Design a protein with these regions (language model features):
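Short, Lys/Arg-rich flexible segments
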Residues: 1-191
Length: 191
């Protein structure tokens, strides 16, 4: 048994006309905005799960930083501190036929790709409490509670940031983006 499909100008024209009409006027912008909204939701969901678009879990925090963060903000996720998260600053922008999804956070790229942060040498004052017998405690205190200050110089150093990809398309995202585009091309936008 043989099946035959013939595509002629008569059969393809109505479908092409529908697709062209769907993208005329605001159609393309609306399609890109719908795709952008979906990608924002998917990216936030992945950030909450602390995983890359391919589903791999983010690398754990370095032991020293984990101790610090657990002491300061126990139970707060990897890319979250002071109740702000990289994911809280995700945005989408449609300009012409282009959709941009990302963040305006200056630290977004270093978390996405990893890398090295150079910290310059610096001098600062540290504050202690000196007892009446002249001994100085070994714990830092606030300037207000201090009666002994010492100037220290910290050398330059590097911080190695492990990549924790948060932006990108999973296989599920690709399928959903195609579905949204198909709906718009068929003249059935979701919005």
């Amino acid at each position: 048994m043989t099946a035959r499909v013939e595509i002629t100008a008569d059969t393809i024209s109505p479908a092409l006309d529908t697709a062209v009409r769907a993208l005329q006027g605001d159609g393309e912008r609306l399609m890109l905005e719908d795709i952008g909204e979906y990608l924002l939701r998917a990216t936030r969901d992945r950030a909450a799960l602390q995983q890359a678009p391919d589903g791999t879990p983010w690398a754990a925090l370095s032991p020293g930083y984990k101790r610090y963060k657990d002491r300061k903000r126990p139970g707060v996720p990897i890319l979250k501190f002071d109740f702000h998260m990289l994911g809280d600053q995700f945005a989408q922008q449609v300009s012409g036929d282009t959709l941009l999804v990302g963040t305006n956070a200056k630290y977004g790229a270093i978390h996405q790709f990893g890398g090295s942060i150079d910290r310059p040498a610096r001098s600062t004052e540290v504050y202690f409490r000196q007892e009446r017998d002249g001994t100085v405690g070994n714990r830092f205190v606030s300037r207000r509670r201090s009666n002994f200050a010492q100037r220290v110089t910290l050398p330059a150093y590097k911080i190695a940031m492990t990549a924790r990809p948060w932006l990108g398309l999973s296989t599920e995202d690709e399928t959903e983006v195609l579905a949204i585009a198909s709906q718009h091309l068929l003249g059935q936008p979701s919005g």
